[in-house]
Amino acid sequence: MVSSRRGFNPIAFTPWPVTILSSLVYLALIIPIIVVHHLVPPAPKESPAGVDLEEAWHDLQHLTRQYHPYNSHSNDEVHQWLLKRIHAISATSARSESQSGPEVFVFDDNQTNLTFSSAGVAATAITGVYFESRNIVVYIRGTEDEPGEWWKSPDGEPSGKGGVLVNAHYDSVSTGYGATDNGVGVITTLQLLKYFTTPGHYPRKGLVLLFNNGEEDFLNGAYAYSQHPMSKFTHTFLNLEGAGAGGRAVLFRSTDTEVTRFYGKSEHPFGTVLARDAFKLKFIRSETDYHVFDGVFGMRGLDVAFMEPRSRYHTDQDDARHTSIDSVWHMLSAAITTTEGLVSYTGDAFDGDSGDGGKLNNGIGTLGVWFDFFGSSFAVFQLNTLFGHSVALLVVAPLLLIITSVALFAVDKMYMFSMYTYISESGGQVSLYGLRGMFRFPLILGISTALTIALAFLIMKVNPFIIYSSPYAVWSMMLSTCMFFAWFISCVADFARPSALHRAYSFSWMFGIMWVFLVIATVYQKQHGIASSYFIVFYFAGVAVATWISYLELFGLPKTQDYARRQGRLSDRTPSSDSHFLAPSADELPSSSSAAGRDFNPEDVEDEEPTESTSLLRGQQRTTFANYASARGSQESNISNQGNNSLHPKDHRLEQKWSIYLMSSAWILQFLLVAPIVIILLGQLGLFLTSATYQIGADGGSQLVIYIGIAVLSVLILLPLFPFIHRFTYHIPTFLLFILIGTLVYNLTAFPFSHSNRLKLAFVQEMDLATGNNQASLVGVEPYIHDAVHAIPSVQDGKISCTSHGYGGRTKCSWPGLKPKVAEGPYKDWVSYNISKTKDDKITRFEVSGKNTRACKLLFDSPIADFHVQGSVVDKRLPHTGPKGVSEIRLWSRNWENTWTVDVEWTKKNSERTGKVMCLWSDDNDLHVIPELDLARKFAPWWVAITKLRDGLVEGSYSFKL
């Protein structure tokens, strides 16, 4: 007996299951991704063995009481405090031991100096640097290290396996307290000293802890470490940094797969290889000490750092108040796991010929791919593995589809790409409508993508900085735009020309597009070592299998000849120009035993006899789009089924009539093959990119690239819905339309900055010591720089000068400032210099000294050929000049009011030997020392944060001409 009501299938390809299930999958994955990205795992209530979190927090508070740049007296105080803490921790560990613990050697490096250049480090012209070290080096002898103090011999060399270096710089910038840049790194390193001198945690290989000084001013401390004997011993490293102000510590970079695996064992790993590629491709312009350890020394290691929010980076909000013990524990736990793995490793992966010209004999690593899953697990594998899978997919996937297509043609079941077929007996033509919907997907994708990207240009035109404080409003707008218009266009197309092949054609188009993307990704993997395209490999793999399933579904259809014969018989009994809209009755459906298991036989199906209960509207075409949803619902109630829920539901009977034989539940398998992995990988990548870039506009970075990036990522994240989106009910798209309208209005009209997301403006005060004239300046973006400058009481409207300032289109506004009080005595005596000629006319000697400072400069209007600082070490690994000469020499001393003697060699082109002698002052811990900076901090709008422009807050100079 025929049931009067069709059985319910919760995963059928009908509007409600498609809408509910797909929405639940997206929400179930996106919400945890956002939560994991922003919430830091809590620190344990009780400190684990070997560490003391309460002690670490108190150390952080002490370290960040004042600004402590290299050129400040508070930096000396931090240096002395660190020495006391190191000795105290070592002594405490020694007293608590019942057995003999590891030897601990502390080196207060007050002898090392070095001359080097900025070539390859900064984007500016070549700059020469002379630096005197204030580093603190701690060596914990490993249980398997060779005994003796080889470093005391001038030519001493370590023996055995190489050691492990953990580095953290203890200087801050002059405008930030340095809680995360790099206070947390420093106290983490102190806790590592405590941990590895605690019984049960002694290192097998030697561990070197480097507290380096001078990173903020040019990576100077890391360069100086090259002259310390311990630099010969360390083969691997872990660099601890901060480029934000809290949150999770991220794996920024890693040199190779082998060293990354140790980090991957952390309890809460966090990061993606995308960051490494961004540095490699110069998308990220700033550098950390990692650059020196890897690029200059040839060491193998990792760069772990905080990365957001950048609005607090290098400002007075980089303090203990704006970080947390949870962030401390996140970095500390990762550092313990990574370091413990490295010092316990006894293999040969980090020893042997490195093939880098003899920098270090630390073996050869392999380029790696890595990314985390929800901050709790970590995938690490070689780039060669990714490349191999990419090539295999590029070859195998198309071949599989071709073979399947050939098989479908062979069994006469290829309905795709077929307009009609012929009845072999009569020669009559029967339409299959197999091309219907073939070009629908590119239309949907093209229009929805174009509209989403158009919003990027609109926001950039009207309110370009809105992302600075409201990145999720931008994301919501982009996602809503893409989703709503993709659904709307799909529904219009489905209303006009319903097609059961929409899914198959959509996946076929996605297959082709992702195949092209994978070709490009594979080329970059091989030729440039770019690994961040890993998501394309997974994306394509899912799409390829989903596409194959769509082709396999066609095997369940009747042969086109059998279908043609049946339609020929029906048309003889029901002549109508609109016969292609008629659907088979309930009795025309195959039974559950025959639907997909055997070929269609027209004799198996009987026509339904009309009765007084037969609907008069049966098989009638829809007449209005307004009735789109209701028509589907009413049809469902009027359709009977013989209990086979695996068949295509008949409420979509305006599609091709043969579609009733397609599997109704296949869509859910296709969706689960593509959507979850895409949401996870691209969702995490999208948030990572957003966190790294959404506030770079204040530094002159291109924000249009960010908006377009979010638009493209939004499309890629929602793309797995496109093959099914025509089945969505109107409820969620309508809700998203309201979200789109609300976020669009907000993004176009809202003020882009807030108390938590202040616009950074960079300060410097330049003083001509010969005349006493000085110019205070703020550098920032238009138009906000003008509002900030005019809010300062000392600024007079008629004396403001604003000019373009270098990279990123920022503006520099200058005005006569209040005279600073950075040194005692008349300002003309703040800098002393003497210029004398030597026997060689090409060489001139400069003697330079400054009051209450240990940083000066020589600037040349045209580059010089070479220079030499008396008493300096020169390392052949670190050239201090280049083919185009040197335009600036930076001089750093560990002693206050030092006198530098510099011999300068001019080039033949130096017909006029002109330039400046300049000294810098960076200590702003006392009020009224730099009164103009005090006024800027006090009276600038609440949405402004003041940071440094260059190494010195105050620059005092004399011009010279020889």
Swiss-Prot record:
Keyword Nucleotide-binding attributed: no
A Pfam family matched in the record: PFF1_C
Enzyme class, broadest EC rank: hydrolase
Transmembrane segments: 16-36, 391-411, 441-461, 473-493, 504-524, 535-555, 668-688, 705-725, 732-752
Positions with a binding annotation for Zn(2+) 2: 181, 216, 314
Keyword Transmembrane helix: yes
Active site residues according to the UniProt entry: 215 (proton acceptor)
EC number(s) on file: 3.4.-.-
Residues engaged in binding Zn(2+) 1: 169, 181, 241
Biological processes per GO annotation: proteolysis
Residue segments, region Disordered: 568-617
Cellular compartment(s): Vacuole membrane
Site-annotated residues for Transition state stabilizer: 313
Annotated function: May be involved in vacuolar sorting and osmoregulation.
Protein name: Vacuolar membrane protease
Species name: Arthroderma benhamiae (strain ATCC MYA-4681 / CBS 112371) (Trichophyton mentagrophytes)
